[in-house]
């Protein structure tokens, strides 16, 4: 009986050691909270957390119709990366939802604050355009990463201030959390 117990203990310690080794093989962990984003380099196993900011949404009545804009202070992000191919790991509420329906990568219009045109409605035609007249939204590709995150690939060539926004239809106030970063030459 003691031999059987000893063999079981050895097997359990081996399984435990193997389980810990497989967890440590994960190069880049998933972000902790929904909406958090890591800017990562998977080939070098490095990452940096994107700046988390709370944007204030305001609606302005323009000549051509109402326009919703998102304002974020300060005017520049503290997180800077080089232009080119960029990968993000973003934690999402439901990994099985279509990422193109609720994730937006957008370029800010930078001045004293960072601002982003969310939607504009034309009074005459009733047409609603998203991303503003200068097409601030960027194309990306998405894949599942881990248990509750997505790996986002985007090619960003223009220097400036950018954000990743996860839309939440249940939000009732005018504050929107965004993950911000800046692109340098």
Per-region residue spans from a language model:
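Extended, solvent-exposed segments with strong compositional bias
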Residues: 119-147
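Exposed aromatic-hydrophobic patches
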Residues: 149-155
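Positively charged n-region of N-terminal signal peptides that target proteins for export
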Residues: 1-4, 19-20
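Sec-dependent N-terminal signal peptides
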Residues: 4-13
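Primarily secretory-pathway and cell-envelope proteins
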Residues: 20-126, 168-185
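A glycine-anchored, Pro-Gly-centered beta-turn/N-cap motif
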Residues: 155-165
């Amino acid at each position: 009986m003691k031999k059987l117990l000893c063999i079981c203990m050895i097997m359990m310690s081996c399984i435990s050691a193997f389980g810990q080794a497989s967890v440590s093989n994960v190069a880049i962990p998933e972000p902790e909270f929904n909406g958090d984003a890591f800017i990562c380099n998977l080939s070098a196993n490095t990452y940096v957390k994107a700046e988390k900011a709370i944007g204030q949404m305001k609606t302005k009545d323009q000549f051509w119709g109402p326009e919703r804009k998102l304002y974020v202070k300060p005017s520049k992000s503290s997180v800077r990366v080089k232009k080119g191919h960029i990968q993000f790991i973003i934690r999402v509420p439901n990994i099985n939802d279509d990422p193109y329906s609720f994730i937006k990568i957008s370029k800010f219009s930078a001045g004293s604050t960072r601002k982003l045109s969310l939607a504009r409605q034309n009074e005459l035609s009733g047409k609603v355009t998203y991303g503003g007249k200068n097409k601030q939204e960027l194309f990306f590709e998405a894949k599942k990463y881990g248990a509750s995150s997505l790996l986002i690939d985007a090619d960003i060539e223009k220097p400036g201030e950018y954000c990743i926004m996860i839309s939440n239809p249940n939000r009732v106030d005018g504050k929107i959390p965004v993950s911000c970063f800046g692109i340098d030459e």
